[in-house]
């Protein structure tokens, strides 16, 4: 059974303690309906070598320990165990000399986002759809006091816990992950900064989702939104067919201008499109740690400006706004 007692104690002592009312039943439901592989993944965590990291560097590659801080045997054991948690999608990580070359170069996204953030020093930060938690560690690097990630993916939880387990306690105590979605979160209005990166296009009701994000941010706090967009003006919104870039669960792709209008209608202020970037096959690709299909397989082989279905290839925008 997955234990969340440490995370819940931290939550009770935080400005977000009201969240406990809805979160506790969700975690009970999670425990009562585990993923079929959850026990196997948990066994991996119990078998990780007991290593002490003297050096932690939360930079482009999130590094925990150095190669000379682990024996060859421990490093080989660590490699084999972490490979059992594939696919690794968001990173990269370097754990005692074991380099996890993830599908996404998530550090590239952070480099696009970071210059446009309010100062995170001392802030309470939430990442909605945090994946394996790579960006949570980068938020701590930027000075956040506490970072909270939510994502319903059980494998992401196990990957996050594997990284956290190898971290010194001082870092572990500031990063928290709950395997839940945003749907049942109360209107906390308590987070200084809320991130949502790579989630909006998966939502059937994107405007409702934006309103939910707004309800979590304190007055004056910042929203950082990253999502796939299409070219066009403030009236342009595309709903693809059954698949977009081979993804079944893509619903609405607005232009950056249309998305800005949505945010304005919801009462956000200081709305700014700070980045507009075409996703490249160097940023999202197959690796030894994610051996399945990746972006190159989802694009038209004769025209990489289009998806395999004939739509515009993924362009991602970053928009910041305040409450």
Curated annotation (Swiss-Prot):
It catalyses: carboxy-S-adenosyl-L-methionine + 5-hydroxyuridine(34) in tRNA = 5-carboxymethoxyuridine(34) in tRNA + S-adenosyl-L-homocysteine + H(+). It comes from the Bacteria. Keywords: Transferase, tRNA processing. Pfam families: Methyltransf_9. Carboxy-S-adenosyl-L-methionine binds at residues 90, 104, 109, 129, 182-183, 197, 201, 316. InterPro entries: CmoB, Mo5U34_MeTrfas-like, SAM-dependent_MTases_sf. Gene3D superfamilies: Vaccinia Virus protein VP39. Its EC number is 2.5.1.-. GO terms for molecular function: transferase activity, transferring alkyl or aryl (other than methyl) groups. GO terms for biological process: tRNA wobble uridine modification. NCBIfam families: PRK15068.1, tRNA 5-methoxyuridine(34)/uridine 5-oxyacetic acid(34) synthase CmoB. Homotetramer. Belongs to the class I-like SAM-binding methyltransferase superfamily. CmoB family. HAMAP family: tRNA_carboxymethyltr_CmoB (MF_01590). Catalyzes carboxymethyl transfer from carboxy-S-adenosyl-L-methionine (Cx-SAM) to 5-hydroxyuridine (ho5U) to form 5-carboxymethoxyuridine (cmo5U) at position 34 in tRNAs. This is tRNA U34 carboxymethyltransferase. It comes from Idiomarina loihiensis (strain ATCC BAA-735 / DSM 15497 / L2-TR). The gene is cmoB.
